[in-house]
Design a protein with these regions (language model features):
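Hydrophobic alpha-helix immediately C-terminal to the catalytic Tyr-X-X-X-Lys motif of short-chain
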Residues: 164, 168, 172, 203, ...
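C-terminal substrate-binding subdomain of Rossmann-fold SDR/epimerase-dehydratase oxidoreductases
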Residues: 35-38, 207-332
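The catalytic Tyr-centered alpha-helix of NAD(P)H-dependent dehydrogenases
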Residues: 154-161, 196-200, 224-228
Length: 332
C-alpha cells in the first residue's frame, strides 16, 4: 500500500462546496478539507445529530440550509461563496429505502443532480465538480470486474437513480462543457458510520456486544468494500488531477481495493479482527439486489496514480476498534 497526501497549497483558502457533507463519506471528506485549510460551505437539508467526525468540523464551515433539488439555492450558494470546487455527494443512499420509496429516491438522486449540474452551468467560477455515482450504476454485467467502458445497465430503483445521476453529469459535460468528473465506488466502511442497517456497522456492534451478527441476504452476495479515508482521498486526488489536467473532465473513475468479498467472508474477517467466533444469523430476505458486483480500479491507478493506502485487514481492524471505543463511550 502506498501513501499519498493532498497538496495543502492547492486546498488552502480554496472555496469548496460539499453537498451531503453530513453523510458518512461527506463527513470524512469535509474533515479533510477543513484540515487542509479550505473555505468550506456545506448544503444541509435536515438537522442530524453530529457524529464524532462531523462535530469536529461543524464550527469551521459555512452552512446553507436547503434541499439539493433547489436549483435557486444552489445558484446562490455557488455565486455568493464563489465556489471553485464542488463535491456533489447528497443522495438517498440506502438500497432498501429506495425500494420502499422510489419517488423520494429519484427526487433526491436524479432531480438533485440535474439541479447541481444546471446551477454549475450558470456558475462560471466553478473549475472542478465531482459527482458521486456508484458501482450500482453498472447493474448486472456478464463479466466482472466492472470497468469504466461498460454500459450503465441499472434496473432496480437505487441503481437506476445513480445511473441517471451519472449520465446527467456526462451530458452536462458533453453538451455544456461543465467541468465534472464522476466517481464510481463500492461500499464505504470505517469510523463514524452509525447506520446500523449497513453490514459493517451492524456486524461490528453485534460482535462487540457478543451477539450473533445478522445477515439479511443469503451471505453469498459479492461486494466491493473501501475504507472511507481512502474514499475521501480518492475525491481529493481526482480534483487535484483535474486541476493539473482539465481534460479529465467528463471522465468516470472506479475506486476500489480490488478485494471482492462475499458477505459471509466479510463477517468472518470482522470476527477475526474482533477476536470472536459467533455463528451468523442468515435471514435470506434481501431482494432486488445484484448477486455480484465489484470494480477494477486500473484506470484510477494508471491515470490518477491513486491506490488505496490501507489494507483490507488493517481497515477492518481499525473499524472494529473505533466501534469498540464508540460503544463503550455510549455505555458510560
Amino acid at each position: 500500500m502506498t501513501t499519498w497526501t493532498p497538496d495543502p497549497d492547492f486546498w488552502r483558502d480554496r472555496p469548496v462546496t460539499v453537498t451531503g457533507a453530513t453523510g458518512f463519506l461527506g463527513s470524512h471528506l469535509t474533515a479533510e478539507l477543513v484540515a487542509l485549510g479550505a473555505m468550506v460551505t456545506v448544503l444541509v437539508r435536515d438537522d442530524v445529530p453530529p457524529t464524532s467526525i462531523s462535530a469536529a468540523w461543524l464550527p469551521h464551515v459555512r452552512k446553507v440550509r436547503g434541499a439539493v433539488e433547489d436549483q435557486a439555492i444552489l445558484e446562490r450558494l455557488f455565486g455568493e461563496y464563489e465556489s471553485k470546487t464542488v463535491f456533489h455527494l447528497a443522495a438517498q443512499s440506502q438500497v432498501g429505502a429506495a425500494n420502499r420509496n422510489p419517488v423520494a429516491t429519484y427526487e433526491a438522486n436524479i432531480a438533485g443532480t440535474w439541479a447541481v449540474m444546471e446551477a454549475a452551468r450558470r456558475s462560471p467560477r466553478i473549475e472542478q465538480l465531482v459527482t458521486a455515482s456508484s458501482d450500482k450504476a453498472y447493474g448486472a454485467q456478464p463479466v466482472l470486474p466492472y470497468d469504466e467502458d461498460m454500459p450503465l445497465a441499472a434496473v432496480n430503483p437505487y441503481d437506476v437513480s445513480k445511473a441517471c445521476s451519472d449520465l446527467l453529469s456526462q451530458s452536462y459535460h458533453q453538451t455544456y462543457d461543465v467541468p465534472v468528473s464522476i466517481t464510481r465506488c463500492g461500499n464505504f466502511f470505517g469510523p463514524g458510520d452509525l447506520n446500523w442497517e449497513r453490514i459493517v456497522p451492524g456486524t461490528c456492534r453485534s460482535l462487540i456486544r457478543g451477539e450473533a451478527p445478522v445477515i439479511r441476504s443469503d451471505g453469498t452476495m459479492v461486494r466491493d468494500y473501501l475504507h472511507v479515508v481512502d474514499g475521501a482521498n480518492a475525491y481529493l486526488r481526482l480534483v487535484e488531477s483535474m486541476h493539473d489536467d482539465p481534460g479529465l473532465a467528463g471522465e468516470a473513475f472506479n475506486f476500489s481495493t480490488e478485494t471482492p468479498l462475499t458477505v459471509l467472508e466479510l463477517v468472518d474477517r470482522l470476527q477475526a479482527a474482533a477476536g470472536t467466533d459467533l455463528e451468523a444469523e442468515v435471514l435470506g430476505t434481501a431482494s432486488h439486489e445484484i448477486d455480484s458486483q465489484y470494480l477494477s480500479a486500473e484506470k484510477a491507478r494508471k491515470v490518477l496514480g491513486w491506490e488505496p493506502t490501507i489494507s483490507m485487514d488493517d481497515a477492518l481492524a481499525n473499524t472494529i476498534e473505533w466501534y469498540r471505543t464508540h460503544l463503550a463511550d455510549d455505555d458510560r
